[in-house]
Structures are given as C-alpha cells and as structure tokens.
C-alpha cells in the first residue's frame, strides 16, 4: 500500500475516533437523565453503570480468538452495526433487564471498535507510531471538550439517540473510503505462555491505570466534599484534564519515544502516587488542586501510551496484535474492578477511604514495579 493510501487510512481512522469520542461524551453527560425518564430508579441505574463493563471483558476474551482471523475493518463494521442496533434499542426498550443487557452489548461494541481502530492505526503508522497514538488521545479529549461546550444544547431525548445512531452510520461510511491491509499470518510456533511472561508488567499497568481512572470518575466528588478541596465538580475537573491533554500529549509521546520507556513508566507511576499523597494536603488551594488533577490525568494518559509503545518495540505481527489485545483486555478488567468496588459505599460515607483504595493499588504496584525494574535490569534498555 502506498504512503498516500496509508495516510488516507490514518486520516479516516482518526476521524472515526473523533466521532466515536463525541458519541461517548454525549452518552456520558446524558445517560443517567435518559434512564430516569424511562422511570428507572437510582439503584437500577447504578447497577447498569456497573454491570455494563462486563461487555468489555467479554469482548476482550472474544477478540483474543478472532483478532488474527478477522480483519480490523470487519471487526469495526460488526462493532458499529451492533452499536447502531443497541443505540436504537434505547428508544424502544423499557424493561430494566433488557436495558441492562443492551448496555452490556454497547460496551462490547465500544471495546471492539476502539481496540480494532487503535490496532489499525498502529499497524499502518510505522515509524510515526508515537505521533498517531498521541493523536488518538488528543482527538478523544477534543471530542469530549466539544461535547462539553455544546452540552447545554444537547437534551436527553429520543432525537439525541437518533443523532448518535446517525453518527455511527457516518463512521461505517468512512470505512468504505479507504483500504485496510491487516496481515493475518499466524505464527504457529509462537508460544503464548512466553508472550504472557514478556507482557506481565504491561498487563498489571493496564489494570492499575484503568482501575484508578474509574475510581476518580466514581468517587472524586465525594472525596473532595469530605476533604473540602477547592475543586469538587467532576465535569470541571475533566475539562481541565482534557484541555491540558490537548496541548501536552504530543510532546509527552515524543519524549517517551526517545527515552528508556521502562524508566519513564516507573517514574510516571511514582509521580502518580505522589500526587495522590499531596492532593488531600494541598488540595484546598485551588491552583495546587488544579495542578495535581492535571498531573494525575496526564500521568494516566502517558502511562497508557508508554506501555503500548513498549509492546510495539517487543513484538510484531501476530504477537503484537495478541499482546495489545491482552493489554486492552486487562484495562477492561481494571475498569470493571473499579466499578465493582462501588458496592462498598465509601465514596459517599468516608471519602478518605478513596485514598486507601488508591494507595493500596498504586503503592503496591510501584513497589513491585521498582523490584521488577531492578531484578530484570530494565534500566539498560
């Protein structure tokens, strides 16, 4: 495939990521209100919000079997078709159980689409991988910021649901405007156990990053109220994070591509832990509160990208696709673990317990990461 076709494919792939980000942001801001209109109770909505992440885990295990048998394009088209059907179902369905199953299927489609789209971009971008990985995060943040600006004009009605379905249709149309060249040469001599051993640290990192992200989304407001922090509103916090990501993510990814990624990974995790330690101490100061939130958001994004770059350096073709999918699957398990932890209502009763959860996960991981770094002499890479 020519360089011109490569960039054409990447352009449409990134455009698809942007549209997809907008749709997910619309759902994020309006999902609860829309379900309340359907006369669902608060407990039912919370249960849907938790169990929907099962779809990502199911998708992860399913794609491990299919990712090297189906092209990225075919998986993307199947995912988008499923998302269109499930989105329209939101208008039709009124039964609580069916709505819950529908949201599980939506998350199945979201995970499958995002994973396949990211693999598509990685396989095409060659030596520019760090740049286009940064663009994925940049456009995801940009889509969220755009919807945040337009949110006063977006109402949780059936018309909004139809618009989301039409945006998915636009994504499908863009798939027919470029060529997909996914390779499917299976290396039957490859030992999966050896592959897993080589990505052990990346899998654990994926779990930690996604678990912490979910904890912030779920518990930060209650924690901030308890500690009387300067910033309490989650939407405002996300706006600060997305704005800084838009400006910082490309330079961050460029730096990561040039330095020892294992050392960068360890350093970012240590910075993350320090920010969580200092947040309750200095968080009553608005400027410091904003600084720590920005650092936490950018650290999580940089760690996510750093581990993808590590996997790209380690593997090729079949092994790379399997390793990346395993990484994304572990991220989905981390998200679900974070959602399950909300069964214990420490987010609303004892906000300080939010920190205990974070310290337990990040602190133990940083300790293990440091041992792993020294044990396997990763500082030499």
UniProtKB/Swiss-Prot annotation:
- Report how it sits in the membrane: Multi-pass membrane protein
Q: Which organism is it from?
A: Rickettsia prowazekii (strain Madrid E)
Cite a GO CC annotation. Answer: plasma membrane
Protein's name according to its UniProt entry: Uncharacterized protein RP255
Biological classification of the source: Bacteria, Pseudomonadati, Pseudomonadota, Alphaproteobacteria, Rickettsiales
Alphabetic keyword roster: Cell membrane, Membrane, Transmembrane, Transmembrane helix
Source taxon at top rank: Bacteria
- The membrane-spanning stretches of this chain are 10-29, 75-93, 98-117, 130-147, 157-179, 199-221, 236-255, 262-284, 289-311, 323-340, 355-374
Give the subcellular location: Cell membrane
């Amino acid at each position: 495939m020519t360089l011109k076709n490569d960039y054409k494919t990447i352009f449409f792939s990134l455009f698809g990521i942007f549209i997809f980000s907008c749709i997910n942001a619309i759902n994020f801001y309006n999902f609860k209100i829309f379900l309340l209109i359907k006369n669902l109770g608060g407990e039912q909505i919370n249960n849907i919000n938790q169990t929907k992440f099962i779809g990502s885990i199911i998708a992860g295990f399913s794609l491990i079997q299919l990712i090297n048998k189906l092209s990225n394009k075919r998986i993307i088209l199947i995912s988008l078709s499923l998302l269109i059907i499930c989105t329209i179902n939101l208008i039709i369905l009124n039964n609580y159980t069916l709505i819950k199953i529908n949201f599980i299927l939506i998350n199945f489609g979201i995970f499958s689409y995002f994973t396949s789209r990211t693999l598509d971009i990685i396989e095409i971008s060659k030596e520019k991988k760090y740049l286009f990985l940064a663009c994925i995060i940049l456009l995801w943040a940009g889509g969220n910021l755009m919807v945040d600006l337009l949110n006063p004009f977006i109402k949780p009605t059936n018309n909004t649901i139809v618009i989301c379905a039409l945006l998915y249709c636009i994504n499908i149309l863009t798939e027919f405007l470029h060529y997909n060249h996914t390779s499917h040469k299976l290396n039957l001599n490859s030992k999966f156990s050896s592959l897993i051993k080589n990505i052990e640290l990346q899998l654990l990192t994926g779990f930690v990053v996604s678990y912490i992200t979910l904890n912030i989304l779920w518990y930060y407001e209650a924690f901030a109220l308890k500690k009387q922090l300067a910033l309490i509103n989650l939407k405002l916090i996300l706006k600060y994070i997305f704005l800084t990501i838009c400006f910082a993510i490309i330079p961050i990814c460029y730096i990561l591509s040039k330095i020892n990624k294992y050392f960068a990974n360890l350093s970012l995790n240590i910075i993350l832990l320090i920010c969580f330690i200092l947040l309750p101490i200095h968080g009553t100061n608005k400027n410091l509160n904003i600084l720590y939130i920005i650092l936490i958001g950018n650290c999580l994004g940089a760690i996510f990208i750093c581990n993808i770059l590590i996997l790209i350096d380690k593997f090729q073709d079949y092994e790379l696709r399997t390793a990346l999918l395993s990484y994304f699957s572990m991220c989905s398990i981390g998200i679900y673990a974070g959602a399950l932890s909300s069964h214990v209502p420490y987010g609303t009763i004892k906000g300080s317990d939010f920190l205990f959860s974070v310290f337990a996960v990040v602190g133990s991981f940083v300790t293990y990461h440091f041992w792993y770094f020294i044990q396997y002499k990763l500082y030499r890479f």
